[in-house]
């Protein structure tokens, strides 16, 4: 959000690479009128088999693990333009599985296709 304020000061509209938690501040993000690049890198499930380890896991961490796959659908519902990237994935082969997971969590198939094709092309001024 700071980058957008700097851009506004100089009359520049940035394309912002998201951190995966945009769903937490969706109203402020919508107000930026910026386009976003979203990674489909979701948090791994936490190992809570050992009670001693489980006590170090915060509610915030567990909530983010649950909500992260809804990030793209939250931007879609707020009419915020975004494209999807495989950046930050530990294994690029997980891209399709994570895309399917995002669709299960509310992202429409049409918007997913648009976020992979039309939106990136539009941001690069390569879409007719």
Mark where each language-model region is.
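His/Asp/Glu-enriched, well-ordered alpha-helical/loop segment
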Residues: 35-128
């Amino acid at each position: 959000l700071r980058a957008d304020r700097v851009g506004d000061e100089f009359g520049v509209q940035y394309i912002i690479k998201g951190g995966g938690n945009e769903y937490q501040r969706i109203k402020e993000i919508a107000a930026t009128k910026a386009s976003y690049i979203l990674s489909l890198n979701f948090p791994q499930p936490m190992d809570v088999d050992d009670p001693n380890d489980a006590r170090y896991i915060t509610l915030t961490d567990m909530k983010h693990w649950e909500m992260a796959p809804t990030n793209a659908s939250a931007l879609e519902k707020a009419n915020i333009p975004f494209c999807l990237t495989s950046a930050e994935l530990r294994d690029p082969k997980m891209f399709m599985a994570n895309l399917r997971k995002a669709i299960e969590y509310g992202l429409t198939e049409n918007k997913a296709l648009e976020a992979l094709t039309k939106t990136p092309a539009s941001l690069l001024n390569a879409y007719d």
